Amino acid sequence: MKREAFKMFLKPGFEKEYEKRHAAIWPELKKMLSDGGVYDYSIYWDKDTNILFACQKTKGEESSQDMGANPIVQKWWDYMADIMEVNPDNSPVTIPLPEVFHMD
């Protein structure tokens, strides 16, 4: 099991839309993540900075950040690109966050 955290950047004024889209996450995306070993995945929003903090666990070495070649992921990126800071391929700009403390 591996834990990973990273931050992403939400464009101002799109908080409710971001929540709405994730409340209706595509079943095929959820299945692909789960089949890929991603679980216990949460995203938190800092309303003062519009930074999104994501935390996830994986059963293997691959995380959601390694699944960008999958067409389902690419379609999701395109769907979310208008409300997030993105790279030229529409992947969200992400910055890995090193773990500095953990308690079971």
Swiss-Prot record:
Spell out the catalytic residues. H22
What's any GO biological process attached to this entry? Answer: rhamnose catabolic process
Enzyme class comes to isomerase
Please tell me where substrate binds in this chain.
Answer: Y18, Y41, W76, W77
Arranged from A to Z, the UniProt key words for this protein are: Carbohydrate metabolism, Cytoplasm, Isomerase, Rhamnose metabolism
What SUPFAM superfamilies does this protein's entry cite? Dimeric alpha+beta barrel
Question: In which compartments does the protein localize?
Answer: Cytoplasm
- Where is the major localization of this protein? cytoplasm
Source taxon at top rank: Bacteria
A cellular component term from Gene Ontology for this protein is: cytoplasm
**Cross-referenced Pfam families, in alphabetical order?**
rhaM
Q: Care to name a GO molecular-function term for this sequence?
A: L-rhamnose mutarotase activity
Q: Which Enzyme Commission numbers does its entry carry? A: 5.1.3.32
Q: Which reaction is the catalytic activity of this chain?
A: alpha-L-rhamnose = beta-L-rhamnose
What does the record give as its pathway?
Carbohydrate metabolism; L-rhamnose metabolism
Q: What does this protein do?
A: Involved in the anomeric conversion of L-rhamnose.
| Family, per entry | Belongs to the rhamnose mutarotase family.
Subunit architecture: Homodimer.
Q: Which PANTHER family match?
A: L-RHAMNOSE MUTAROTASE
> What's the protein name?
L-rhamnose mutarotase
